[in-house]
Amino acid sequence: MARLDKPKIELDLPDRPDPTRGGGAWPLMLDHVENWAWRNGLFTPEELDTIISIGESTELVKASTFGKQSDKNRNSFVTFLFPNEITNWIFARLAGAINEMNQQFFQFDLTGMEQGLQFTKYTAPGEHYDWHIDKGHMTASRKLSISVQLSDPKDYKGGEFELMFGRKPEKINRERGMTVFFPSYTLHRVRPVTQGTRYSLVAWISGPPFK
């Protein structure tokens, strides 16, 4: 995984001591944040089928971005799942994985899930979500994003999930049940589905502002 280039930020700090003249030096601070992390096997195939059935049993609506619809940028159908007696096990499973992966790979200060789980359906021909980040002026508290691959890769073509860290997109493994964790400021997209249907489950975890 490529390291994420950090923007240059000008800070009003005291002058650094010159180590050649004594007086010590600024300590080297290591960045413990990974670009992204993944795990599989969080849900069994039968459980993934159940999640799809739960999502399909609700009313899906055309996806929008900050209340605006644009097929050029985002073309899919979504619904939100909230904790109840039918879905509590999904939230519990994800919560355990999020705590574990955040502690191991990101160490973000997190407070909880911003909203429910977004169940998304991408259908051929052409439904997609172009390059975007999950953190914005209306979603500033988002810090960690999670995407679960619900579909069997044999059930669709296209629909690749990609993350951008350098000059070339990084394609994520299409294995069913693959769960991807990445900072919400990461540029990512879902390429157009050319055949079949792709289902995913997305969560955003919030916290205080980055420091």
Language-model features: where?
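Fe(II)/2-oxoglutarate oxygenase catalytic core
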Residues: 1-179, 185-211
